[in-house]
Amino acid sequence: MILKNISLLIILFFSISTFSAGHSLKNISITVVAPATGADNKTLSDLKNINGLNLQISSKCFAKGKLPFLASSDAVRFNCLRDALFDESDNIVWSLRGGYGSARIIPDLLKLSKPNTEKVFIGYSDITALHLFLSQEWGWKTIHGSNIADLLKPEQDQGNFTKLAEILKGKVKQVTIDNLVPLNDIAKSSDLVNGKLTGGNLTMVQTSIGTSWQIKTKGKILFLEDVNVAPFRLDRELLHLKQAGLFEDVKAIIFGSFGKDLDATMLVLRNFADSLDIPVFKTNRFGHEKINDPIIYNTNSKIIKSKEFKLVMGL
């Protein structure tokens, strides 16, 4: 009986949290896109049934292709994303989830002319590939933030969506990432760092190297996060970025969460920070863990020090 009551309380808490997050997004029209991995019918149905959400989810965009880890074929995923980005409505274009597949449709995106109207585009993880394309090729200010399916994850802080809603509704003039911890001496002595933001998922940033959509880091504040990365692999990926010249003329680096941030992971990050002559910071405020605060590509930003270091993004 006790276990049953606990289970009921957990379900009730999750339902209340999901309702609260959904309510914060009330009256915001959202077109859901799946440029990477898809979801089963139950997940899509559960999203549609969240009270207060105005989601447009086209069933044609979830017709399974030959590869089971993709939402649909490359052609279908591209067409659905293109239609959402070029739609003349003021709908927010919000990625369903990450997984894998976004990079596969970039060659087709490169053939398109920039739309007349800039859309608000949200997502993270594998969606980093699209952020790099949209921010670099079209000059858009896209938002690195929770995918819409994260509304259904009880382990996610639903405040992630409250903060996104405040941005979408124009309730805030700036966005902040708090609790930046300096990892090297040059970061500790920094008072002000200015620059526009780029970055995202480390695996996808590494994947971009040598492609037509390779990340452009010069003069930027670079933010990076990842999940399920063994410490030796993390060191290898960061070394690849360094040897590829991606840290040259970077204003600063901000590391988000890397899984549970084990002692070995932090050792890798601190050791790597010490090898660079640019400020390097660490925070747990964005990434694949519970908290995933929004970060805006291409916006004028600054790292400032008051009582602590924080990132401030203008809107």
Predicted feature descriptions by range:
Residues 213-265:
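Internal helical hairpin/lid segments
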Residues 2-9:
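Sec-dependent signal peptide recognition
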